[in-house]
Amino acid sequence: MIRLFAAFPLPEIISADLSRRQKGILGARWRPLESLHVTLRFFGPLPENKADDLDSELSAISGRTFDLSLEGVGVFGEGVDVHAVWAGMAPNEPLMQLARQCERAARRAGLAREMRAYRPHVTLAYLRNASTDEVGAWVQQNNLLKSPSFLISRFGLYSSWPGENGAVYRLERPYSLS
């Protein structure tokens, strides 16, 4: 079984800006620069034959390159159950279309439908026992985040492996947009 997801990495300049915001919350496990990405679809653990089917379907996706920018920050969870902080994406129809294509590819490969609504974001930190005051202050300090636009010309099929400081991601297959 291999744990897989479709995503695209961020340009270094965008990741570097985000890394400067990764402070101010005790109990936060800030994601390393090289792990920052935008997930298009999480597939979960798959046997190798299903992963091959998924790769075939993802490689058939056709789409054009598009510009994207970060906009705003938020949290997953509520109150004392907040478990992650993230940077959001400016509304972008080509991004949403690419995510829908990844969902259709998953269905054609025999995977179950994703029941959660797609919310494009970059996870910046996972939280454990973080102060709600600190989290609230961090959101207020960073809520006007707006990055320069950047070009998305590819995405990939990534695997996730347990690591000493959280999951380690490895690009298994790259896919180009034209």
Spans of model-derived segments:
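Histidine-dependent nucleotide/RNA phosphoesterase domain, centered on the 2H-phosphoesterase fold
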Residues: 1-178
